[in-house]
């Protein structure tokens, strides 16, 4: 039971780190990055469809993204979804591909994005700590109910603390990299 509890906690912590990575990727840095559009949904034949399923991405230079739809009839729908997205893109359509030029970020905008990244990072850390708290409660219950010994419970708690620290450190590392990326001119 202890191993299952630890394994479940680790899986949930890994998921929290993955969500943080996706959140960080969706924040633009003034550099072309297809990850900006991971959450864009296109109304394709009446059904919201992720952009990655409808088109391929190419990055010809540091500030341009070319989006080539697999189905040319979806070009207008994709362009509309990009215009409506929170990314702040101005797509131009030449009939075959959609070209997006990423504008340079102002100093104020960069600082704003750093604050957003820090908030998302802190949310991820809180999520990891909540997972730790729930796992610790489950471990304490196992010891209390006599399903595990005191020594096993203490060892498992130390292992849980190690997992928590490793995942929080992982978030901190992601945070540092994204901050450096944002502040780089």
Curated annotation (Swiss-Prot):
<dbReference type="Pfam" id="PF01765">
    <property type="entry name" value="RRF"/>
</dbReference>
<dbReference type="InterPro" id="IPR002661">
    <property type="entry name" value="Ribosome_recyc_fac"/>
</dbReference>
<dbReference type="InterPro" id="IPR023584">
    <property type="entry name" value="Ribosome_recyc_fac_dom"/>
</dbReference>
<dbReference type="GO" id="GO:0043023">
    <property type="term" value="F:ribosomal large subunit binding"/>
</dbReference>
<comment type="function">
    <text>Responsible for the release of ribosomes from messenger RNA at the termination of protein biosynthesis. May increase the efficiency of translation by recycling ribosomes from one round of translation to another.</text>
</comment>
<dbReference type="GO" id="GO:0005737">
    <property type="term" value="C:cytoplasm"/>
</dbReference>
<dbReference type="InterPro" id="IPR036191">
    <property type="entry name" value="RRF_sf"/>
</dbReference>
<dbReference type="GO" id="GO:0006415">
    <property type="term" value="P:translational termination"/>
</dbReference>
<comment type="similarity">
    <text>Belongs to the RRF family.</text>
</comment>
<protein>
    <recommendedName>
        <fullName>Ribosome-recycling factor</fullName>
    </recommendedName>
</protein>
<keyword id="KW-0648">Protein biosynthesis</keyword>
<keyword id="KW-0963">Cytoplasm</keyword>
